[in-house]
Amino acid sequence: RLFNFARRNLDWNLSQRPASPSQLKQNYSSSIPISNEMATPVNTTDRLKHLRELMASAKYNINAYVVPSEDAHQSEYVAACDERRAFISGFNGSAGCAIVTMDKAAMFTDGRYFLQARQQMDDNWTLMKRGIPGVPSPQDYLAEHLPEGTRVGIDPTLMTATEANELKEKLQARGNGDLVAIEDNLVDIVWGKDRPERPKNTVFIHDIKYAGESHDSKVARVREFIEKENASGLVVSALDEIAWLFNLRGTDIDFNPVFFAYAVVTRDKVTLYIDEAKLTDAVRSHLSGVVVRPYHEIFGELNTLSSSLVETKSHLLVSSSTSFALVQALGTDNVKMSKSPITHLKAIKNAAELEGMRQCHIRDGAALANYFGWLENELLNKDGNLRLSEVDVADKLEELRREQEHCVGLSFSTISSVGANGAIIHYSPQRGSDALLDITKMYLCDSGGQYLDGTTDVTRTYHFGEPTAWERECFTRVLKGHIALDRAVFPNGTSGFALDPLARMPLWELGLDYRHGTGHGVGSFLNVHEGPQGVSMRKTIIDAGFNAGMTITNEPGYYEDGNFGIRIENTCLVVKADTKFDYTGGSGYLKFEPVTMVPIQKKLISSELFTDVERKWLNDYHQEVWRKVSPRLEKGSLGYEWLKRETSPM
């Protein structure tokens, strides 16, 4: 959301129009045009000049303009046509908020992107390091650091109603000015004809054997919530929620199988607002009973609906992530803010989805075993050392992943990072400026795949030479935190906020830490990041407790600027724990079941820091990896022999 920054810059190049899942393998590609964005800052002088001319014009007459990362659906990941903040600033990380005044340009981002933002932005921009003492939030910056009478412009489709109202109140309370909703997006005007076109790719049906529940059943469960809230209906704007609700998938946003649409569910009607050119005959048949309307008509129809809501003294439910523009169309008196029921329904995976997650991670593990077996051989036995680049090997990993059954592409752009690049937490290598693999340095690889039966996300850190004692200690402390979180048993409903310190304590003992959350939910052939659950120090997740059926990643790390990065990530299922007693009185206890099946490098472990309990955990985990993954590998192959060695007992 606008000021609640997300995790990672992910690009999924799905430029084709697959009519069915069978076409996805050949159409999904990450072979995108490569630039030197990480090496050379973008010159934004002319862009900012044009933007400020628009701001100063009589038509708009504003003193500041807010450019968020999100699109009209408050998506974490956006299509190329919606990368407005990246265009105006040059910084293309997934998390950030740009504020442009008549004489300043400020970029607010968090610790995951400090290095990347500094590299990608020119001298026109000031980096505002979120989380550092003394650095204001974007709201406080606007309210406290601008002169009295300031008019702050926003695109109302790109800011949530909650955030817009909070900012407006702050501005007015301090007497500094007002919030101005501008229908035209000023960055789009500056961008002009060079702005990419909005995708119009066809959508396809997500088979019931993978979804595990019909869309009619899902709608019925949503209606139960609507009736419980004594409301007339629910407005759905989050793209992954719409895809989940209708058992449809799309290719409008890179790496994310979603499509541009809105939906309104009432007690007696379901309306899907979508470009009808996206619908095949099969999808139209699938949507029997659903009213289909053009995408942009939702604003007019909500405005018309507002009159009947006034007459009946009823309300439509909207979530806190609903845009200011949608709430304006309905009228604030006609809406009731509520947590979207779909967020929680989607987070609790059914039996088919859980089995799909287990199976796709086994196949993903086979791809990674083949990859690391190949990579080690290239570096140590061939001439790959100081020849293969970060992009070269990332491309090889994608090739091997796509060979797996049901794989249709990547779930995010592979973070393939050597040495100092590993310290850029969400580094995105670009051909031409990417580093060469070096067996004297750490190699961090964070990657994932999209499969018809699930989504994967895994990080491993390896050293193909001789690690230093300090590298081994840091790695071991990260692993100790990973194991501590994995072994946790906790009451049903416990928040990840309470569990997060388990992963950090081994680092805290030395006064070390990492500037990112420890875990996030993972979709089922959907977005690689989903809520409401998470493991983090952020208080926003306190109310999002764990329930059986959820997914979560476990990914502590440690990063030294200019030196190396370490992260160990497994995707896990939240399952019931069999405890001797039940102090909860019936709600029971939970634990994590790791489904990622990839070895953790023993060579990087300092045995003197490792306890017997931790050693047993690692050996048990590796035994499970070998049992599940080895049957999928060719005996005697590089991947098979690598997996056999790496999963041998410590």
What are these regions (language model features)?
Residues 9, 13, 25-650:
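Active-site neighborhoods and metal-handling regions in enzymes and metal-associated proteins
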Residues 21-23:
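Compositionally biased, intrinsically disordered low-complexity segments enriched in Pro/Arg/Gln/His
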Residues 1-5:
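N-terminal chloroplast transit peptides
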